[in-house]
């Protein structure tokens, strides 16, 4: 199962999922839309990581799937870690450019945090929407976001009454994000309840702090085989876009380990 980041969707991972399935035809690959995202329903509050875990398990049960690996990008990584340390059938967890520790934003202006700035921008224009997709792209550009973010967030736009609009409960989405910020996944990483945990980090990304990188590398030495840290030097936060082939090769080989 592949779990996207906040304000993303399973469609962000469509190419990667297809390529992984082509490499391993006997594997089933499921790139989900998390609650409040993409084509998924809103689900019932509370909007916490635990609720997302329950949603994924309910979907897998409904489809009759046995989940054996969880891949999570950014926000999705802590869901993947919770799945991997609570579901016996899951042998592999792969965290993509996400810090396992809590994120402390105390005293930091929201404008200085890109994802919060993006949420605030969507909140401002949510009622009016956009006449064209190009207008949406220009809005993001004026807010300091590039083409990659437009492609990622734009998967949540729907056509309604002649305009492109976000059908998002942005306050609930932010509640999910803040719960993820508060959650400390280090105890899950250091436990022995998941057989293999890998951390794929964009070399140009600042999401995983230097202290966390050092801690992960120490764990890799202490628990060889179980913990693996892989730095994708040319990649930023969107490793699956910036280093698509290298990430695909790593995931493919690691899950055969």
At which residue positions do the language-model features occur?
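Structural cue for short, hydrophobic secondary-structure segments
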Residues: 2-5, 31
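Active-site glycine-rich loops that stabilize anionic/oxyanionic intermediates
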Residues: 5-11, 74
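Alpha/beta-hydrolase active-site loop signature
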Residues: 7, 34-38, 100, 236-239
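Active-site loop/oxyanion-hole signature of alpha/beta-hydrolase fold enzymes
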Residues: 14, 21-71, 75, 106, ...
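Flexible "cap/lid" loop of the alpha/beta hydrolase fold
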Residues: 81-85, 89-130
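Conserved alpha/beta-hydrolase catalytic His-Asp/Glu region
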Residues: 127-179
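Conserved serine/cysteine hydrolase catalytic core
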Residues: 161-224, 228-231
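Catalytic histidine-centered segment of alpha/beta-hydrolase-like enzymes
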Residues: 232-248
């Amino acid at each position: 199962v592949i779990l996207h980041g906040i304000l993303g969707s399973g469609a962000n991972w469509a190419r990667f999922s297809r390529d992984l399935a082509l490499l391993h035809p006997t594997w089933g690959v499921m790139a989900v839309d998390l609650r409040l995202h993409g084509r998924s329903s809103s689900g019932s509050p509370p909007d916490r990581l635990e609720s997302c875990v329950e949603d994924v398990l309910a979907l897998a049960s409904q489809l009759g799937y046995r989940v054996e690996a969880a891949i999570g990008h950014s926000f999705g990584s802590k869901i993947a870690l919770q799945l991997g340390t609570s579901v016996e059938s899951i042998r592999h967890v792969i965290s993509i450019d996400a810090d396992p520790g809590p994120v402390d934003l105390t005293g930091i202006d929201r404008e200085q945090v890109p994802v919060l700035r993006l949420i605030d921008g969507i909140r401002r224009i949510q009622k009016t929407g956009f006449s064209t997709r190009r207008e949406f792209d220009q809005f993001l550009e004026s807010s300091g976001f590039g083409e990659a973010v437009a492609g990622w967030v734009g998967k949540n736009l729907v056509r309604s009454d002649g305009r492109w609009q976000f059908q998002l409960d942005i306050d609930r989405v932010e509640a999910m994000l803040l719960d993820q910020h508060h959650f400390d996944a280090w105890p899950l990483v250091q436990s022995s309840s998941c057989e293999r945990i890998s951390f794929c980090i964009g070399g140009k990304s600042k999401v995983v702090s230097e202290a966390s990188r050092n801690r992960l590398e120490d764990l890799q030495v202490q628990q060889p085989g179980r913990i693996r840290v892989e730095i994708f030097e040319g990649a930023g936060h969107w490793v699956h876009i910036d280093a698509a082939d290298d990430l695909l090769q790593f995931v493919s080989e690691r899950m055969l380990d």
